[in-house]
Amino acid sequence: MRKKCSVCLWILVLLLSCLSGKSAYAATSTTIAKHIGNSNPLIDHHLGADPVALTYNGRVYIYMSSDDYEYNSNGTIKDNSFANLNRVFVISSADMVNWTDHGAIPVAGANGANGGRGIAKWAGASWAPSIAVKKINGKDKFFLYFANSGGGIGVLTADSPIGPWTDPIGKPLVTPSTPGMSGVVWLFDPAVFVDDDGTGYLYAGGGVPGVSNPTQGQWANPKTARVIKLGPDMTSVVGSASTIDAPFMFEDSGLHKYNGTYYYSYCINFGGTHPADKPPGEIGYMTSSSPMGPFTYRGHFLKNPGAFFGGGGNNHHAVFNFKNEWYVVYHAQTVSSALFGAGKGYRSPHINKLVHNADGSIQEVAANYAGVTQISNLNPYNRVEAETFAWNGRILTEKSTAPGGPVNNQHVTSIQNGDWIAVGNADFGAGGARSFKANVASTLGGKIEVRLDSADGKLVGTLNVPSTGGAQTWREIETAVSGATGVHKVFFVFTGTGTGNLFNFDYWQFTQR
């Protein structure tokens, strides 16, 4: 469905460009919202909302609600109704700039959702995921929590951060009837935290009581946030949930630990009269000496995304540590705004640094398009999945039949003349590269131009892609390269004369001299 919707989107872009008398593509296709040199949004070839991070084995994984464009009968874009939030998108990176697309986890399975492939057969939706890893019986086990709309929390398990996933209990983990959950207006937005002793905790909840006419007291102290202890198996709960009296609570629970202190963070609501230290739509935070609370309000650290990027909407975040640096991942309506001039409620993931002060307070985050810098160089002499890139000129990704990772290998597709992908800071070394190979599949054929630092930069090699006999008939092709030494952005520019998708692109690798 995402592929179909995305194709419809590019048709719309082409039609609009024709009406304006301008080509939708120049000699090389332009970026949408993540422009060359910037790190935000993390991706712009598809959307992703409510992001949360997991760091594992030298990579950071970002899990997101499956925002996807909805269309009116005339082909125009609707405002987001969240009807497509039944999957979880996953991307990962070792360097914070080049992101690998791992595709979608088909979470919800009720009423034939996800084409009957949905994992949680009882769930009609999968909103706002959270993720944790814990060693159980000597083996790392991964736990993906999600909200079934606003009615409860479910959990999936896997032996790797990208699956395959199963539903271990076949029902919700937490519902309104769970002890201590009474009074929660929206039982959603889970945040899971595993403490140093291996004990897990689940935070969730939101909303303001009073239905359509809350009082000032209800706006100020909704008392709709909860924390409950998880069992050793992470798929059961222990005892009763405790209330977190988060002032002006709206949604979006988060928990991180810094210097022995527990930080509960959340999105402040938009109603009533707010004091200056609790501004509407921003991320507030509280601290405690215990993961179960009580928590004390300390301040706020992330303005509503509309303050930085326009578009407004809800604010959703997660704080994480990666290679001894603290970051916050959040969403903003940047990609949809770039395409349509208005966000329409469709969101994309961003990351900026987060700083704790010496007194334990958190500095205001300066959200921006620049984002974070690349923390390590990419090794071009390793096999690199084509769906790993920092920037792109209007391509798509889709599930592949080519042999790849343990689950859900992807490839780059919807390749037209002038499209491209690029990676940041590949280190060829002093000796440089002597050859380049790629795994491709094609009915039409074309070329991959290998260029340095820009889409029209120094040409170091050209790979001719023949027809392989089909869009899923894979063949590894190799060509000589010259002049690729040192550290560079690497652009793979696609050319060809055929109509339609020129070829599919699975992976690439350089050989060292």
Swiss-Prot record:
Q: Which domain of life is it from?
A: Bacteria
| Key words of the record | Calcium, Carbohydrate metabolism, Glycosidase, Hydrolase, Metal-binding, Polysaccharide degradation, Secreted, Signal, Xylan degradation
Localization: Secreted
Question: Which SUPFAM superfamilies does the record cross-reference, listed alphabetically?
Answer: Arabinanase/levansucrase/invertase, Galactose-binding domain-like
Domain (CBM6) spans 382-511
| EC id | 3.2.1.55
Q: Which Pfam families match?
A: CBM_6 (PF03422), Glyco_hydro_43 (PF04616)
The record's disulfide annotation reads none
Q: Detail which positions bind substrate.
A: N314
Enumerate the Gene Ontology biological process terms.
Answer: xylan catabolic process
Quick one: which residues bind Ca(2+)? E385, E387, N409, Q410, D506
pH dependence per the UniProt record: Optimum pH is 5.6. Stable from pH 4.4 to 7.6.
GO MF, one example: alpha-L-arabinofuranosidase activity
What top-level class of enzyme does the UniProt entry assign?
A: hydrolase
* TM stretches of this protein: none
Q: Outline the temperature dependence of activity.
A: Optimum temperature is 45 degrees Celsius. Thermostable for 40 min from 4 to 45 degrees Celsius.
In this chain's numbering, which residues are marked as the site (Important for catalytic activity, responsible for pKa modulation of the active site Glu and correct orientation of both the proton donor and substrate)? D189
Is Secreted among the key words of this record?
yes
Question: In what pathway does it function?
Answer: Glycan degradation; xylan degradation
* Signal peptide stretch: 1-26
Q: Does the keyword Cell wall biogenesis/degradation apply?
A: no
* UniProt record similarity statement: Belongs to the glycosyl hydrolase 43 family.
Query: What note about domains is in the entry?
Result: The CBM6 domain lost its carbohydrate binding capacity.
Q: What does this protein do?
A: Cleaves arabinose units from O-2- or O-3-monosubstituted xylose residues, thereby assisting in arabinoxylan (AX) and short-chain arabinoxylo-oligosaccharide (AXOS) degradation. Is more active on wheat bran AXOS than on wheat water-extractable AX and rye water-extractable AX. Does not display endoxylanase, xylosidase or arabinanase activity.
Q: What is this protein called?
A: Arabinoxylan arabinofuranohydrolase
Species of origin reads Bacillus subtilis (strain 168)
